[in-house]
Amino acid sequence: MKETIISDIHCIITKPDRHNLITVVVETNEGVTGFGCATFQQRPLAVKTMVDEYLKPILIGKNANNIEDLWQMMMVNAYWRNGPVINNAISGVDMALWDIKAKLAGMPLHQLFGGKSRDAIPVYTHATSDTMEGIYDLVEGFLEKGYKHIRCQLGFYGGVPTDLHTTQNPTEGSYYDQDQYMDNTLTMFKSLREKYGNQFHILHDVHERLFPNQAIQFAKEVEQYKPYFIEDILPPNQTEWLDNIRSQSSVSLGLGELFNNPEEWKSLIANRRIDFIRCHVSQIGGITPALKLGHLCQNFGVRIAWHCPPDMTPIGAAVNTHLNVHLHNAAIQEHVEYNGNTHKVFPNAAEPINGYLYASEIAGIGVEIDREAAAEFPVMYRPHEWTQSRLPDGAIHTP
């Protein structure tokens, strides 16, 4: 097979909407260019530096066809490995290499994987509001569009706090009360079931906001409303408590968006402590490890629901769709509809049709970046207040 030599690599950071989005561009001597998602929006410049200063020098002149070898080299070259900055940087290159290979083969990415196991993947979207009336309005609109799975949140993560009993001169941060959050969320579930019955599946993201004993209680009480799954009921460093939850509740659990290292998910899958793996594909290093993870999950009856939030390029979202139509144990894909600027920067970005996402049939990933349009929306960074989550006494808590 003729070698395809990597001739250049660079990063593009753009902010067409609320989030800084990072795209890696890999060029070859064959004139075929690949694009990959490397978005770590809280540390965009760190990822760009990793790509431009550390990965590019070891990749120029290498054969782009040897994806597995290049992935392994990128992962171990710094000796220290499996962190969010390096994994996202590797992901951007890895996705771009798969994009190149599929373009050279003249087939869409899912066909390169081995073809489809389904026609399309069901989608869930987000209905978030500070009031139940606001949630109802959003739900009505999504039902009209054909969605059958909706993640419902009363307020931002941690809920809508009222009458917080804080300290004098409290430390700056985003405050919430765990008991209020649990009570309000259970009331939300009850109200949605009373109003809509089983017209749609309800999902909910705890987003690590509870202590383990509270998570057990919440899982027991929310079970009666039959959520499709409860996401991130515990942080990654408390997953041994999942056995306690499993022994007291049959509620379906999704976990994994913060995972970087295979050691974080292997025992959860092998011991069937979760129902859905929620890894963020760029956060674990791209397509190469995602395919392996998907196959591992299938052996243990764990289904796939990749993390696919707005702070991901449409390139990364398209990769998720290709993975989902290929992997037999894929269950659902998260999606928040794009604004006009995002469609301008990323032509062919897919939107759901009647509650389903369809994989592109264009050779490669099927979504690229318009570099001129991207330049209209330069990177902007500010510290994120929502990740400075605090309890009423001022103690910081996992966001």
From Swiss-Prot:
Keywords: Magnesium, Metal-binding. The keyword Magnesium applies. The keyword Repeat does not apply. GO terms for biological process: amino acid catabolic process. It comes from the Bacteria. InterPro entries: D-mannonate_dehydratase-like (IPR034589), DgoD-like (IPR034593), Enolase-like_C_sf (IPR036849), Enolase-like_N (IPR029017), Enolase_C-like (IPR029065), Mandel_Rmase/mucon_lact_enz_CS (IPR018110), Mandelate_racemase_C (IPR013342), Mandelate_racemase_N_dom (IPR013341). SMART domains: MR_MLE. It holds the Pfam family MR_MLE_C. Gene3D superfamilies: Enolase-like C-terminal domain, Enolase-like, N-terminal domain. GO terms for molecular function: magnesium ion binding. Mg(2+) binds at D205, E231, E257. D-arabinonate binds at H207, E257, R278, H307, E334. Belongs to the mandelate racemase/muconate lactonizing enzyme family. GalD subfamily. Has no detectable activity with D-mannonate and with a panel of 70 other acid sugars (in vitro), in spite of the conservation of the residues that are expected to be important for catalytic activity and cofactor binding. May have evolved a divergent function. Homotetramer. This is D-galactonate dehydratase family member VSWAT3_13707. It comes from Vibrionales bacterium (strain SWAT-3). The lineage of its organism: Bacteria, Pseudomonadati, Pseudomonadota, Gammaproteobacteria, Vibrionales.
